[in-house]
């Protein structure tokens, strides 16, 4: 039997599975769809935006990760994250009061920081897992005229990127491969890389809501597993477009470059929470970049959307090459 590798399901298989469940409820505005970050349901005056996402690559501050990665997906639809539910699956013979209290504290502090209400969930100790898993469920709301869906992106749109890539991957590797990194680069380097979850930070809620307030945004996408390259693929898949991306415009932090070089992994395919992709009319690009900058968020134009027939191209060292694709995230070669 051929078993699937760690990571996301094969997209062609996922498309076939999604097609088995046609949406008949007219109140479902956005259902399951590759390239969209959340579902959208009509709730009268506003839309309810709903998302679920687990945290599996790390156990460090797992409650904090669960809140932030789900909030990011809600915000990428232009919505404000409001209500959070969590399913905690805890390993038998490894779970104690200290572990559970730490996870709960992380969830509570993280929701409070984003003005989100923890409103429910489920806890369970299982003999079938060997580490804690948190599955987050986030709900948000948005004015109907401010909803952002990626199907609205079109050829000619500018593509912007907030902050830099592989922020989450850098932080996780620094936490999981501390000894090797300390030996190679020293203690200060390790601490800086581990602190990436706070600075530059994994949250893009502020990035997304500021951009959506400043201009008419055609698409926003929160690249996560599979890195920036997969995020761009998902955005263009949803919008039926192609893209030209300039490698030299993509911000890659020094720590990220050094970690990727040491472990021979590609930062374009490394889990990328903390960055936000934005597609918009070029006339609004400067306005959005300036507003984000005034709020302490770096934002760079990294390319343009093109016709779908032109595919995904990366301009690297003056040459166009095909955008690399990653069936599994680069981090899986180091952490399983």
Predicted stretch roles:
Residues 1-336:
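Helix-biased detector of long, well-ordered alpha-helical tracts
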């Amino acid at each position: 039997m051929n078993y699937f590798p760690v990571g996301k399901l094969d997209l062609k298989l996922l498309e076939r599975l999604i097609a088995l469940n046609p949406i008949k409820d007219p109140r479902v505005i956005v259902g399951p769809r590759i390239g969209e970050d959340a579902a959208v349901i009509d709730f009268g005056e506003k839309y309810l935006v709903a998302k679920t996402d687990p945290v599996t690559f790390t156990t460090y501050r797992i409650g904090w990760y669960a809140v932030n990665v789900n909030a990011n997906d809600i915000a990428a639809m232009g919505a404000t994250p409001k209500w959070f539910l969590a399913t905690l699956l805890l390993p038998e013979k490894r779970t104690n009061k200290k572990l559970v209290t730490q996870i709960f504290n992380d969830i509570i502090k993280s929701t409070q920081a984003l003005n989100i209400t923890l409103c429910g969930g489920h806890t369970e100790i299982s003999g079938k897992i060997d580490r804690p898993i948190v599955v987050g469920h986030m709900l948000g709301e948005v004015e109907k005229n401010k909803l952002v869906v990626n199907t609205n992106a079109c050829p000619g749109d500018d593509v912007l990127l907030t902050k830099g890539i592989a922020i989450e991957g850098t932080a996780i590797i620094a936490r999981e491969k501390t000894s090797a990194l300390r030996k190679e680069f020293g203690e200060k380097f390790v601490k800086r890389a581990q602190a990436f979850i706070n600075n530059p930070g994994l949250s893009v809620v502020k990035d997304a809501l500021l951009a959506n307030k400043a201009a008419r945004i055609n698409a926003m996408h929160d690249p996560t597993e599979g890195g920036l390259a997969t995020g761009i693929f998902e955005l263009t898949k949803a919008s039926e477009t192609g893209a030209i991306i300039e490698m030299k415009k993509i911000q890659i932090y020094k720590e990220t470059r050094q970690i990727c070089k040491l472990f021979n992994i590609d930062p374009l395919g490394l889990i990328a929470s903390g960055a936000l992709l934005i597609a918009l009319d070029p006339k609004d690009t400067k306005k959005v970049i300036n507003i984000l900058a005034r709020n302490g968020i770096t934002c760079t134009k990294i390319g343009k959307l093109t016709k779908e027939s032109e595919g995904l191209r990366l301009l690297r060292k003056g040459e166009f090459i095909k955008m690399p694709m990653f069936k599994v995230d680069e981090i899986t070669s180091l952490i399983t």
